[in-house]
Swiss-Prot record:
Enzyme Commission number(s) from the entry: 4.2.1.-
Protein name: Scytalone dehydratase-like protein Arp1
Keywords: Lyase
Family: Belongs to the scytalone dehydratase family.
Amino acid sequence: MAQSLTPSVETDSKTGPSKAISFQDYLDLSALDWARLRAVLAPTLYVDYTKIGKEKWDAMSADDFMAMVSNDDFLGDLCVKTQHLIGATYWERVSESKVIGHHQLRAAHQVYTSPDLKTVKLRGHSHATNEHYYVKSGGVWKFAGLKPEVRWNEYKFEEVFKGSYTQSEKQSLP
């Protein structure tokens, strides 16, 4: 019987499948549940956005990662709604304390004219593969980074995020 390599914040990978990180982090990101997302983060993350024209951080602190993703110029924009859907997935065990998840991903985004979310301004969706890194930290599996590779975008994806993804110059961490 195949062993599940799905990392979990609640169980060891040897005890069986769990939805805690492989599914819940996407629910948290899409629902903007920042506290719950923060709880599954490793102390430092590898963040490589070079394949989507942005920067790479070999060791970004969890606090800096949270500041980046929750920033008003990125996913913290109250006028942006998003849902990240995971498709096909396979797991690569690097060591007893490190796993790489290879995920097919569709990220749907809708931007509204105001935070009341009544009038849609634009849509932008991305189809990608994503490497997600997981490490065991303090005996618990944690999300330790990502490396997306966009296959193609729909609609006006490049206009969804007013800061992080629409400006050509390098952005510094908040």
